[in-house]
């Protein structure tokens, strides 16, 4: 999960990383109020999860309150690379003597943590890495030993930071490592990490990516979720612990197991070529449980997608037997009632398949068609979706 800058700075403050004072707002009046509270020149900064804010006019220096208000008016609603600005960070402007770069990230290729540091900050680090790779130091970090002050100082030295700020930089670098580890981050980046005329070190910007797989031990991270930017169907699925990804097709898909669902996407896409080019509408994996509640939650998500014209339920009975799946489908349709208004093509195979098919046949729901093979089911689902377009 990528964070907004203001959220990254909340984590920085939690771990005593020095930053400039400021608050977030979503109104022009709020920006003016914050600027008045600070009582000094401020930076008005667009809060979007994309780079290039400054070049796009999303970061403005404001010498006084009136300038802050005018800049807030100009930035709110601005489109930056497809991201509309809905929030602003109004922060105290800092005197800058020099700009550096520091980050911690997970190096998947080498299966280790990596620190990157450079005396050349304030610019796109990708440009520095390409045009002057020697200016960007890359230091592997032992996951067990971590980063103490001595190692943090060696990171700053490798990045060729000036000797007079090494101690102050080491303190900040060590605290950024603390953010990285204690918050279960995949990336912690500060660009620029600035030196003030008084040789103070400040994190003027911040980029943090959190590991969503660690959410179970980070209950506070739920507050960082950007619900405005997340598809409402994906939010509903997440609330019900369903693995769901919305796609752009017309055939809704429910399966048990990621491999089976991905295979189902392929066969539906292939079948769709014969039926007007219809495509899969989603990826939805209900995992090992196919109870009536789980099936109802899954169908509720898919049937609320206006693009979906038919639903393909593809289940291989293993630990969860096919009769349990069939009972889940029947129960789900009863639970949903009139909301279940699109045809379902069901393919069952595996443990207790005959009993599962018997249960569905006995229920005789007018929306349900039971098909024997995966290819036949995909073809039928694509045909029904095309007919309903």
Swiss-Prot record:
It holds the Pfam family Ligase_CoA. Residues 9-236 form the ATP-grasp domain. Its EC number is 6.2.1.5. Mg(2+) binds at residues 191, 205. Binds 1 Mg(2+) ion per subunit. GO terms for biological process: succinyl-CoA metabolic process; tricarboxylic acid cycle. The keyword Thylakoid does not apply. The keyword 4Fe-4S does not apply. ATP binds at residues 45, 52-54, 94, 99. Pathway: Carbohydrate metabolism; tricarboxylic acid cycle; succinate from succinyl-CoA (ligase route): step 1/1. It catalyses: succinate + ATP + CoA = succinyl-CoA + ADP + phosphate; GTP + succinate + CoA = succinyl-CoA + GDP + phosphate. One of its GO terms (molecular function) is succinate-CoA ligase (GDP-forming) activity. Belongs to the succinate/malate CoA ligase beta subunit family. NCBIfam families: PRK00696.1, sucCoAbeta. This is Succinate--CoA ligase [ADP-forming] subunit beta.
């Amino acid at each position: 999960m990528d964070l907004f800058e203001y959220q990254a700075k909340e984590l920085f403050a939690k771990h005593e990383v020095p930053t400039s004072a400021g608050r977030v707002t979503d109104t022009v009046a709020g920006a003016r109020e914050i600027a008045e509270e600070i009582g000094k020149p401020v930076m008005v900064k667009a809060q979007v999860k994309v780079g290039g804010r400054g070049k796009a006019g999303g970061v403005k220096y404001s010498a006084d309150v009136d300038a802050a208000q005018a800049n807030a008016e100009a930035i709110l609603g601005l489109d930056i690379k497809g991201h509309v600005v809905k929030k602003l960070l109004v922060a105290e402007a800092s005197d800058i003597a020099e700009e550096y770069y520091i980050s911690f990230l997970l190096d998947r290729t080498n299966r280790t943590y990596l620190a990157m540091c450079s005396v050349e900050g304030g610019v796109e680090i990708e440009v520095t890495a390409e045009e002057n790779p020697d200016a960007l130091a890359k230091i592997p970090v032992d996951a067990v030993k971590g980063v103490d002050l001595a190692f943090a100082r060696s990171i700053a030295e490798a990045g060729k930071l000036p000797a007079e700020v090494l101690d102050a930089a080491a303190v900040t670098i060590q605290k950024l490592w603390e953010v990285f580890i204690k918050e279960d981050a995949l990336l912690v980046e500060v660009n620029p990490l600035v030196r003030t005329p008084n040789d103070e070190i400040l994190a003027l910007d911040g980029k943090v990516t959190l590991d969503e797989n660690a959410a179970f031990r980070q209950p506070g991270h739920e507050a960082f979720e950007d619900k405005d930017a997340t598809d409402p169907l994906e939010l509903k699925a997440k609330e019900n612990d369903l693995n769901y990804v919305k796609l752009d097709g017309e055939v809704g898909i429910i399966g048990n197991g990621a491999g089976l669902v991905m295979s189902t996407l392929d066969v539906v896409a292939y079948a769709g070529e014969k039926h007007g080019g219809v495509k899969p509408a989603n990826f939805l994996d209900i995992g090992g449980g196919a109870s009536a509640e789980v099936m109802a939650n899954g169908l509720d998500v898919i049937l609320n997608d206006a693009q979906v014209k038919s639903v393909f339920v593809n289940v291989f009975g293993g630990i969860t037997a096919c009769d349990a799946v069939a009972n889940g489908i029947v129960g789900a349709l009863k639970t949903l009632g009139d909301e279940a208004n699109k045809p379902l093509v069901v393919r069952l195979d595996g443990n207790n398949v005959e009993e599962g098919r018997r249960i569905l046949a006995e229920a005789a729901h007018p929306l349900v068609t039971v098909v024997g093979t995966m290819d036949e089911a995909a073809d039928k689902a694509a045909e029904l979706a095309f007919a309903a377009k």
